[in-house]
A protein has these predicted regions:
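Active-site rim/adjacent substrate-binding subdomains
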Residues: 1-140, 145-188
Length: 188
């Protein structure tokens, strides 16, 4: 089932997400719905807060990039209760980022190129790995959502001031995108 994506201004996007208990109801269906929503919206990553659930769940599908980045062929994974446990700050990189919850806004964000991540897979098996490159960037972006952060929190105050009108338009529902969204209720 395709779910609406919550846009900038929704309170759930600013909440710190809770760990998912092992007996979470219909977790496999939720993961399937998130992947379907991600495909429909033509994104590469989706965090549960973006669909209105304050739980630590992220899905990432980098297979769509396989023509340019063959190392991501068939890379389609859920990350349950993920946490970044270490940042290797010895090398950072600035790259433009966008977000399904911030349609039509793209800004350069500087992030470490290598991180250590712990998570559970779809079978609830634990993993602890160092991740680098583009996947590290995507994970940092998506895992930020689980901590109530968005990429615009990582740009300079000047850049944030320059996109102020775009953010205001999002809050007012004045934007276009090719996927279902959940807006803030209109104030009377």
């Amino acid at each position: 089932m395709i779910l609406p994506i919550y846009t900038y201004g929704q309170p759930v996007l600013r909440k710190v997400a809770e760990d998912i208990p092992t007996d979470y109801p219909d977790l496999q269906q939720l993961i399937a719905d998130m992947f379907e929503t991600l495909t429909e919206s033509e994104g590469i990553g989706l965090a549960a807060p973006q669909i209105g659930k304050a739980i630590r769940l992220v899905v990432i599908d980098l297979d769509v990039l396989a023509d340019d980045m063959p190392e991501y062929k068939d890379f389609k994974r859920p990350f349950i209760n993920p946490h970044i446990v270490e940042y290797d700050d010895s090398e950072t990189e600035s790259q433009e980022e966008g977000c399904l919850s911030l349609p039509a806004i793209h800004e350069k964000v500087t992030r470490p190129t290598r991180i250590r991540v712990q998570w559970l897979d779809v079978d609830l098996q634990p993993h602890d790995e160092w991740v680098e490159g583009f996947l590290a960037r995507v994970m940092q972006h998506e895992f930020d959502h689980l901590d109530g952060k968005m990429f615009i929190d990582r740009i300079s105050p000047l850049r944030k001031q320059l996109i102020k009108n775009k953010l205001k338009a999002l809050l007012q529902g004045r934007f276009r995108c090719g996927y279902k969204t959940k807006l803030l209720p209109k104030k009377n």
